[in-house]
Amino acid sequence: METFSLKDCSSVASSPISSPNISTLLKIKVLSWSKETGLPASVHVRVCNKSFNLHKSLLCAKSGYFKEREDQLSEIEIPQEFPGGAETFEKIMLFIYGCPTLIHPFNIAGLRCAAQFLEMTEQHSTGNLCERFDLYLNQVVLQNWDDTLVVLKKCQDLVPWSEDLLIVSRCIESLAFTACMEILDPERRREKPVIMLEGMVNQPWEYTNIERIINQDTWIKDLTDLPFEFFKKIIGSLRRQGMKERYVSPLVALYASKSVIPEGQTNTDILQRALDLLLTRDKAYRFVPVGFYFACLAHNLKHDTVLKLQDQIVSLLHTAQPENFIYPKAGNRQVAFSQELLTMESLFSVYVSTESERHLTSSSSNVRVGKLWDIFLSRLPYDQEMKTTRFIELIETVPMSFRESHDQLYLAVNAFLQVHTNISQEEKGSICSYLNCQKLSQEASLELVKNEKMPLRLVVQALFIQQLNTHQAFKDCSDSFRFTNSADFSGSVVPSSRPLTSQQSPCTDDETGPRNRPLCFLMQKDATLDEFESTSFRIHNLEEQLVSLKKSLHSHDNLKKPNCLGKRSASRNKNTFGQVTTACIGSVSFTSQRKYANRLLQILRRVNLFGSRKTNRSKAGESER
């Protein structure tokens, strides 16, 4: 047998960076003790198919377990459930023989459980192993986040010993307290806001987005990497210590998401249990985006859980994104009655029923839901097996009062007609009867007019609506330049020399968006602003001339001479405007009156000419396009 000196044993065992062969060190210590005392190793201990020859006197002095078996035979069998196995037993024996034992977060949990199994407490020896390990746990391990995580993960293989000795609970409470401090720390909040999921409301619930959020905070990443049983205890401790639900619920959602996405790696059992943590809390759904619930709904869960998920989705449906929806797989010949479509139809139907009971049919949330449903219909992978009646049922799932705009509904109808090319005109008319051309934007109307799949009657309606919009736009534009303070001529006021700005013009876009713009402006929007400014200036000049003529006529009526009643001949005087004034209205000649009328007609012709030129330009623009 190869020999080693005690000096080598001590130096190797105490070195923090070396990895000594524990079995060899133990053999050295046993041989050294036998030489020093002259006593042989009289006890044969067997642990997990590994045997050790040890001294009974040392074992009984340190361990209550061996002391109770002192009168037994010289061979002792340690049960298979001994925590830590043979390797941990060797480290415990090194301590008994006086060799310094390397203690670190990776082995402290196993050593503490093994010491408890062997009853190495203060009752049998002062400064025994149980007390030393507890001191190391409390003053070293639990003061550090990373060390606590290491010990907690090691405790997973030491259950129930680690739980009975409160190692798990101490680690849980320490981690939860540190997490609360991370959120409450004002300095940290200034430098880096606490991670929540508000930013995910307008984003699809995808793996890349979830992974990015998890990796932004170390403490969130560490907690979501824990085994579920420990994570569950962490959540309970966070709630007991007062962490707000707005932080706890997103943490549960992130943990559950790791078992849902990416696809093909779903752990349904963990997902089910994680959802139980979330769905049992009142109002916890407020802090989790609806996309998470849609992602969970696509998996095989218990019926009760599915019902709870649907309730959460219905309450948050107006905040959903089309990317969050579950769609039938492309190529599925049973799209009309696929599970995905039936589920989505049920969700929207429940929402409509709930809102109908509350008599809220025109709220912004309902308008949002109506648009989402039409978007969903426009993205369905339609097949020829879907009947027209089934498609009409889908349209009627959401009432028409929920639809302020029919743009998305038009896209859905168009998608259906593109696949069903052989349906009758009667069926096509039934489907298109749900479209209201007055609720289509200019872009959608223009596309509808060009779409050969649309019925001719609908195309004519769209053209008629656009003509009305164009006529109204010209009327509004004309009315905006009238004078409003003159009762005799046109009821308008002399405008200022400054032309109207684009913000003041009724012909430019406003907050209502492009939906209310007439078709002519859509087709000429590149030249609209320049044309408006030029038109404004020309009309301004024309109206100044009209006002000048009106003043001249008034002056002519009011200027009379006192002796005009008895005279047929009148002296004529011209004013600065070149207009004739007379002593009496009856003395004005027919020639002068026709002169004034001709001037008025010329001005009116110029106004009419302006309107015809604008119409010609509009027609020219349409022909070019």
Swiss-Prot record:
Entry protein name: BTB/POZ domain-containing protein At5g48130
Protein task: May act as a substrate-specific adapter of an E3 ubiquitin-protein ligase complex (CUL3-RBX1-BTB) which mediates the ubiquitination and subsequent proteasomal degradation of target proteins.
Gene Ontology biological process terms in this record: protein ubiquitination
Protein family (similarity comment): Belongs to the NPH3 family.
Domain of life, source organism: Eukaryota
Gene3D superfamilies: Potassium Channel Kv1.1, Chain A (3.30.710.10)
Domain NPH3 span(s) in chain numbering: 217-469
Pathway: Protein modification; protein ubiquitination
Region (Disordered): 494-513
Composition-biased stretches (Polar residues): 494-507
Keywords: Ubl conjugation pathway
